[in-house]
Curated annotation (Swiss-Prot):
GO biological process: glycolytic process
Textual note on the cofactor: Binds a second Mg(2+) ion via substrate during catalysis.
Binding residue positions for (2R)-2-phosphoglycerate: 163, 337, 366-367, 388
Record protein name field: Enolase
SMART domains cross-referenced by the UniProt entry: Enolase_C, Enolase_N
EC category name: lyase
InterPro entries: Enolase, Enolase-like_C_sf, Enolase-like_N, Enolase_C, Enolase_CS, Enolase_N
Species: Bifidobacterium longum subsp. infantis (strain ATCC 15697 / DSM 20088 / JCM 1222 / NCTC 11817 / S12)
Described function: Catalyzes the reversible conversion of 2-phosphoglycerate (2-PG) into phosphoenolpyruvate (PEP). It is essential for the degradation of carbohydrates via glycolysis.
GO CC annotation: cell surface; extracellular region; peptidoglycan-based cell wall; phosphopyruvate hydratase complex
Entry keyword Cytoplasm: yes
């Protein structure tokens, strides 16, 4: 047993300079674990509650000292003496201590910090790297890195309506080759934008964030960059979008403010279909608002046999919402964010439910990140075959990509790159 001996939380800063929670946990056998909690900019309304202090005179109200206090004074006394390796029992206890449906008492940032710290301590106690501890010998497939090279939406002061334009280098034999291709396209894109006289400042996730005349202009520049870097769009590198449509959806009118006009759901569906006919798009995240279940079901029925539709705000890594989507035929892919649901156990449950029902899973960072690399290990451990963690720039993003390089090296000849197999719905563009 990895008996928990001590738990301690502190307030630290994330990649946007906002406070977040760090939890340090030690077991009686000397194993140590640290849990660093990320934070999102565009968040789903159904996400687990992130506890903030609300004192506008300190960090603009974004302090997390109350979440830290919840760990040190409420959670720690209850979990000391428990087996850190019994992840479900530990997480269930914290959820019970909270006693609300959305972790609205203690805060998901408090609970997740302890959950992650226990996970790391247990892996160290077992003498295993995290991906091996979680996934056993089955964890050997390196994910396709969906790299956010142009930022918009809430990540870049709405330079474009669409929040993320990602490249997906799936047409390569190894992860390291794919990463290299993505990096080369990223740097080439900077030159393409400069030649057009466009700003090359960066958004929250390291992608370029120039103000565009239309959402489609970004796609054209990315296509130019892929070709200029010496790669073939569609065959080697595809495009993924995170529309984050809830951010520009008007609940009162039921319409989307898109490209400067009010658009209804029928228009948006046709727009997406036209886009995928024109560009090698393999994945669209949050094409409709987070409660637009009928629209989600409609687009999945119409285009789901040729495209991946990823539920982020729709599903919030919540097994209950995922089950509703399965029942309705809404979406065909789950975005996985640990802090959306607030515990390791519930995150693993969501991935397993998705897999059992034919949904793909894409493990994801948040816009407010830390140097933590849990999501890299998680993607390999659960064979999700996809990860998104920003542009190949900014240390908190690159740390995740570098961790995958380490894992690839550790796995040696047993390492496999997911490549085309990551996007099983996208038969139009991808090799058989």
């Amino acid at each position: 047993m990895a008996v928990i001996e001590s738990v301690y939380a502190r307030q630290i800063l994330d990649s946007r300079g906002n406070p977040t929670v760090e939890v340090y946990l030690e077991t009686e056998d000397g194993a140590q674990g640290k849990g660093l909690v990320p934070s999102g900019a565009s968040t789903g309304e159904a996400e687990a509650w992130e506890r903030r202090d609300g004192d506008k005179s300190v960090y603009g109200g974004k302090g997390v000292l109350n979440a830290v206090k919840a760990v040190n004074e409420v959670i720690a006394p209850k979990v000391i003496g428990m087996d850190a390796a019994d992840q479900r029992a530990l997480d269930d206890l914290m959820i019970e201590l909270d006693g609300t449906p959305n972790k609205g008492k203690l805060g998901a940032n408090a609970i997740l910090g302890v959950s992650l710290a226990a996970l790391y301590a247990s892996a160290e106690s077992a003498g295993l790297p995290l991906y091996r501890y979680i996934g056993g010998t089955n964890g050997h497939i390196l994910p396709v890195p969906n790299m956010n090279i142009m930022n918009g939406g809430a990540h870049a002061d709405f330079a474009t309506d669409i929040q993320e334009y990602m490249i997906s280098p799936y047409g390569f034999d190894t992860y390291s080759e794919a990463l290299r291709a993505g990096v080369e396209v990223y740097h080439t894109l900077k030159n393409v934008l400069k030649k057009e006289g466009l700003n090359t400042g960066l958004g929250d996730e390291g992608g370029f964030a120039p103000k565009m005349k239309s959402n489609e202009d970004s796609l054209k520049y990315i296509m130019d960059a892929i070709s200029a870097a010496g790669y073939e769009p569609g065959k080697q590198i595809g495009i993924c979008l995170d529309v984050a449509s809830s951010e520009f959806y008007n609940k009162e009118t039921g319409k989307y403010r898109f490209d400067g006009e009010e658009r209804d759901s029928a228009y948006m569906l046709d727009y997406y279909e036209n886009l995928i006919n024109e560009y090698p798009i393999v994945s669209i995240e949050d094409p409709f608002n987070e409660e637009g279940w009928e629209d989600w079901a409609a687009i999945t029925a119409r285009l789901g046999d040729r495209l991946q539709f990823v539920g982020d705000d729709l599903l919030v890594t919540n097994p209950a919402r995922l089950q509703k989507a399965i029942d309705l035929g809404a979406a065909n892919s789950l975005l996985v964010k640990l802090n959306q649901i607030g515990s390791v156990t519930e995150t693993l449950d969501a991935i397993e439910l998705a897999t059992a029902n034919g949904y793909t899973s894409m493990v994801s960072h948040r816009s407010g990140e830390t140097p933590d690399t849990t999501i890299s290990d998680l993607a390999v451990a659960k064979n999700t075959r996809q990860i998104k963690t920003g542009a190949p720039a900014r240390g908190e993003r690159v740390a995740k990509y570098n961790r995958l390089l380490e894992i690839e090296e550790e796995l040696g000849s047993t390492a496999q790159y997911a490549g085309y197999t990551a996007f099983k719905a996208c038969k139009k563009y991808l090799a058989k």
